[in-house]
């Protein structure tokens, strides 16, 4: 049985497409029973603190999705607010609002999510942060 070096593994990974890397990460998570989120927090920290620290790191969310649950009574004001927040054109914003529940923004920080939620609720929309 031949031994594969770290350099050979890195060269192999470098040759993969983004989709293949995503599939590789998923397969590694399943095989080893780990989460890539815990690895991103820092492998040394996860090993030193044990499983409890990994659970805490997973619980503290840093990126949020802003979801328009419904547009309420004032659809026009909500469309204007969505246009201002997302930079979409009138038709795209209207289609997005009418397709509620719909994700308006993904992966935003907590402050931006709260600001967006506040402006949309002032326009009459129902908004969720996930």
UniProtKB/Swiss-Prot annotation:
A single Gene Ontology CC term: cytosolic large ribosomal subunit
GO biological process assignments: translation
Listed transmembrane segments: none
GO molecular function, one term: mRNA binding
Keywords for this protein: Ribonucleoprotein, Ribosomal protein
Short name of any one Pfam family annotated for the protein: Ribosomal_L12_N
Family matches, as InterPro entries: Ribosomal_bL12, Ribosomal_bL12_C, Ribosomal_bL12_C/ClpS-like, Ribosomal_bL12_oligo, Ribosomal_bL12_oligo_N_sf
UniProt similarity note: Belongs to the bacterial ribosomal protein bL12 family.
Function of the protein: Forms part of the ribosomal stalk which helps the ribosome interact with GTP-bound translation factors. Is thus essential for accurate translation.
Assembly and oligomerization: Homodimer. Part of the ribosomal stalk of the 50S ribosomal subunit. Forms a multimeric L10(L12)X complex, where L10 forms an elongated spine to which 2 to 4 L12 dimers bind in a sequential fashion. Binds GTP-bound translation factors.
Name of the protein described by the UniProt record: Large ribosomal subunit protein bL12
